[in-house]
């Protein structure tokens, strides 16, 4: 059985990930990140994720609302060497839900299905998962 460090906004930085690995975590997540940041401001995304010299496996959780942007961001993350890509479909935080992301995606299951299908087409090597509450 594998042990995962979950993505925690404000906490899952490089230091915590290294500590959790030292204590036996098999897979560690970065903090969740907006797909728009990965696409439009890749330097900022790399700085936030701190995965340049990361040990593997490394996992990233994406949030967003547009299938085209989420799938493009997933492709970019895979090219950066990310081993696991997770779609956030559970975050109840008001500003995430207001942007039609996180748990708001559950309001329109056909749209969610479209997102999943498009992301799967872009992800070739990384493992894909969905966070839901």
Specify the residue positions occupied by each region the protein language model found.
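Glycine-rich, proline-tolerant flexible connector loops at the mouths of alpha/beta enzymes
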Residues: 32-43, 89-109
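Alpha-helix-loop-beta-strand connector modules within alpha/beta enzyme cores
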Residues: 46-61, 103-130
């Amino acid at each position: 059985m594998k042990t995962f460090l979950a993505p925690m906004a404000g906490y899952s930085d490089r230091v915590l990930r290294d500590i959790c690995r030292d204590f036996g975590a098999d897979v560690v997540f970065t903090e969740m990140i907006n797909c728009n940041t990965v696409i439009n401001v890749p330097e900022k995304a790399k700085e936030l994720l701190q995965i340049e010299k990361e040990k593997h496996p490394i996992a990233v959780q994406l949030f967003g609302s547009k299938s085209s942007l989420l799938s493009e961001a997933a492709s970019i993350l895979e090219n950066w060497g990310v081993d696991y890509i997770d779609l956030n479909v559970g975050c109840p935080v008001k500003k995430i839900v207001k942007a039609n992301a996180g748990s708001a995606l559950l309001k329109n299951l056909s749209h969610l299905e479209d997102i999943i299908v498009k992301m799967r087409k872009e992800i070739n090597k990384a493992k894909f998962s969905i966070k839901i509450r």
